Amino acid sequence: MDSFFASMTPWPRNDGSLHVYALPDEALRDRLETVSVLLDDVAGLPRMPLSWLHFTVSRLAQFDDIGQAGLTALCDALTRELAGLSPVAVELGAPAPGPVGVTVEAPASPGWDALVAAVRRAAAAVSDDPLPPAPHGPHVSLAYATAPVDDAVVVERLAGATPVGGFTITGLHLVSVTVRPELGTFDWTELASWDLPVG
């Protein structure tokens, strides 16, 4: 496993990147903690703090310096595009190591794809800047590697971990994200939120 932060395309700055997230509720956070603690003290693989666990629906091209008018336009566009979309059920598997971290993943679904598409349409409606790539599917990152990590150590730690199970996404959050490569974490400030269905 290689460093996530060495392989990621650098942001123009490390703070203020606008994202739309879905957030776990307390029950899901408890289930994620059960598998996250299996990674305690793995060198080069700090666990994401439970309060910052999230599903990325889309990273946007804009940063939080777009001003109040820009933020209002973005929120209005998101409200329009999300109108009528229903909550989305996801079925999360067991934690698994990847090339740059450990994730808990769920298969994509028409409902998930509709959420991602709606958010990206809204972002494109208020900015000509090209959007970053969409996420490969619904997932929660439990840990991001900050240095090379022996995959065998991670596989051994996760042996016997069971699927996390079902969760229903009932809301979305527009957030201003800070990446902290020195800590191996992301955190954010919430700017707006929507319950599903909107309207």
Residue ranges and their predicted role:
Residues 1-199:
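Histidine-dependent nucleotide/RNA phosphoesterase domain, centered on the 2H-phosphoesterase fold
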